[in-house]
């Protein structure tokens, strides 16, 4: 299971205010003034509160291509952040498959926007695709897999999300991708979902070699919790 020391899960259609864990240890013999001082220092400089933003309330500046999925918002040292996910529509291409039928291409999107005193601007657009598929395209975000954390305690939040995609004719593992994003740094895990105990393996990107403490454990823990593709049905 994933350790709650490093992050808190966000599930769609819910609101969670994330708080820093309280300090443990023996408090016996602590004076009233010392206790008050400890309480003050335990308050984080930035309280990363994550909430689901209904479609009608997601700012119009937060554009998303094709089929809009959801919008989430949190605040950190850089200001108010928005994360929007969407799914492209399958497009028929000029390529032909082995059977002579047209093939299709489909894209999946994720957008990170930031709101400051100057307005809302796009920080990153993330895009992936299945290209020239002559069979069935199966593609979607893993909707319950969205997390906002501050594992390195630098007051700049990281967010984590996952999606799956494949071109297939049967029930088999899909390509599965997990991303942790902090500022302009992206840490990627790629592999296969697990279907009927087949698949589930993954590979960490080389960027994890110099990742902050906790990032690797965070990524592998989430992967293990969400690798079962059939568990979504």
Where are these regions (language model features)?
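Surface-exposed loop and turn segments in beta-propeller and other repeat-based domains
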Residues: 123-138, 196-209
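C-terminal motif of bacterial Sec signal peptides marking the signal peptidase cleavage site
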Residues: 19-22
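Short consensus segments that form the blades of beta-propeller domains
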Residues: 85, 92-104, 134-139, 166-172
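Acidic, small-residue rich beta-repeat scaffolds with periodic aromatic anchors
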Residues: 26-79, 174-176, 181-233
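A short, structured loop/turn motif at beta-sheet edges
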Residues: 147-157, 181-186
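Acidic/hydrophobic-patterned starts of short beta strands in beta-sheet-rich repeat architectures
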Residues: 78-86, 152-163
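Bacterial N-terminal signal peptides that target proteins for export
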Residues: 2-11
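Beta-propeller blade repeat segments, especially FG-GAP/WD-type strand-to-loop junctions
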Residues: 105, 109-124, 170-193
């Amino acid at each position: 299971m994933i350790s709650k020391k490093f992050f808190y899960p966000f599930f769609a259609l819910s609101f969670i205010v994330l708080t820093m864990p309280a300090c443990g240890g023996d408090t016996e013999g602590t004076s009233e003034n010392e206790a008050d001082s400890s309480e003050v220092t335990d308050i984080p400089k930035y309280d990363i509160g994550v909430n689901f933003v209904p479609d009608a309330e997601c700012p119009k500046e937060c554009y998303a291509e094709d089929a809009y999925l959801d919008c989430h918002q949190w605040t950190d040292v850089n200001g108010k952040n928005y994360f929007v996910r969407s799914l492209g529509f399958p497009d028929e291409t000029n390529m032909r498959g082995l059977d002579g039928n047209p093939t299709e291409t489909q894209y999946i999107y994720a957008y990170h926007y930031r709101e400051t005193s100057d307005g809302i601007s796009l920080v990153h657009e993330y895009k992936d695709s299945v290209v020239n598929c002559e069979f069935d395209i199966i593609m979607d975000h893993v909707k319950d897999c969205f997390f906002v954390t501050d594992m390195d305690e630098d007051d700049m939040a990281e967010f984590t999300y996952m999606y799956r995609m494949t071109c297939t004719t049967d029930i088999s593992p899909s390509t599965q991708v997990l991303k942790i994003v902090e500022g302009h740094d992206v840490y990627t895990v790629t592999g296969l979902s697990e279907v009927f105990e087949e698949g589930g393996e993954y590979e960490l990107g080389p960027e994890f070699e110099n990742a902050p403490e906790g990032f690797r454990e965070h990524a592998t823990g989430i992967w293990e919790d969400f690798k079962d593709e059939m568990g979504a049905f």
